[in-house]
Amino acid sequence: MSVKNAMTAEFLRSAYGGESMAHMRYLGWADKADKEGFPKIGRLFRAVAYAEQVHATNHFVVLNGDVADTALTAGAVFGMKETAENLVGGIMGEEHEVEQMYPVYYEAAKFQGEKDAMRTFHFALQAEKQHAELFRAARECALAKKD
C-alpha cells in the first residue's frame, strides 16, 4: 500500500502519532487505575490501548512506512491524574477523533481517491465512538467508587 497525495499522507502521519501516543498514555493510566483499586478500569484502558496500537499500525501500513524525517505531535491530554480525571482525558481525546479529526481525514482521503486511507480512517472512527462510550461508563463507576 502507498499514498499518492501529500495531504492524505500528512493526515495518516498525524493519526499514527496520535494513536501511538494514546496507546502509551492509556497503558500508564491502566497502571494508575490498578493502584487506585479499579482493576476493571485498568483492563479497559489496556484493551483500548491495544486498539489504539492497531489503529496506529493500520495507518503505518497504509503509509508503507513513509514516516521518515517527519516530526509527529498530538494535541492530546498529557499527564497522570486520578482515574476519573484520566477517563475525562480519554473521553476528550476520543470525542476529538470522532467529531473532528477522523471525519475530516476521511473526507480528504475520499476526495483524493485514497481508498486504503479511507478504510483505515473509517475503521478507527467507528472504534473511537465505542471507546468514548466505554470511558463514559467507566467514569461513572470511578466517581461512584465502583469498579
State where each predicted segment sits.
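Non-heme di-metal
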Residues: 1-147
